[in-house]
Design a protein with these regions (language model features):
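A generic structural signal for ordered alpha-helices
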Residues: 14, 20-22, 29, 53, ...
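Short, low-complexity N-terminal intrinsically disordered segments enriched in polar/charged residues
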Residues: 2-49
């Protein structure tokens, strides 16, 4: 049995458009993104009870005050509202590149395509997500939506 090369490790999640930095194992954020894309409620099993969650938008006038949570119940409410108000037709992952920053911290560049309910049009977005995981659960999530472009 041969060890995987670094290039093979980087491509372990290519089926979901997710790549990782060299030398990493599957981070929780990669699993969370796959479940999010699939609309799979198993996503909740990857979230810590005391999750610190927030989505920010760069130069966007959208009301995002509700896009934060400090516990798993609040996260479930945000996730439900995202599904209803932002992603009513789901989302498609175009790319996700995750880098292991050490000590449970990860940085992900995330690209997705979705029907954006706010503008009633197909859109693509690029975001940067900083996460922390401990004991197989994500306990910190900060997403900065840098662009939402109608296509």
């Amino acid at each position: 049995m041969s060890a995987k090369t670094e290039a093979q490790k980087d491509n372990t999640m290519k089926d979901a458009g997710i790549t990782q930095g060299a030398g990493t194992t599957d981070p929780v954020i990669a699993q969370v993104l796959k479940h999010f894309e699939a609309g799979d409620p198993a996503i909740m099993g990857l979230i810590a009870a005391d999750i610190d969650f927030r989505i920010d938008h760069y130069k966007d006038d959208a009301d995002i005050a509700w896009q934060s949570a400090t516990d798993i119940e609040g996260f479930a409410q945000v996730l439900t509202r995202l599904g209803q108000e932002v992603f009513p037709q789901g989302t498609q992952i175009l790319a996700a590149d995750t880098q292991d920053l050490g000590n449970g911290w990860f940085l992900t560049r995330f690209e997705q395509r979705f029907f954006y309910a706010r503008s009633a049009a197909m859109a693509e977005s690029v975001t940067f997500i900083t996460t922390h995981q401990e004991d197989g659960k994500m306990d910190f999530f900060r997403e900065v939506v840098t662009t939402v472009t109608e296509i």
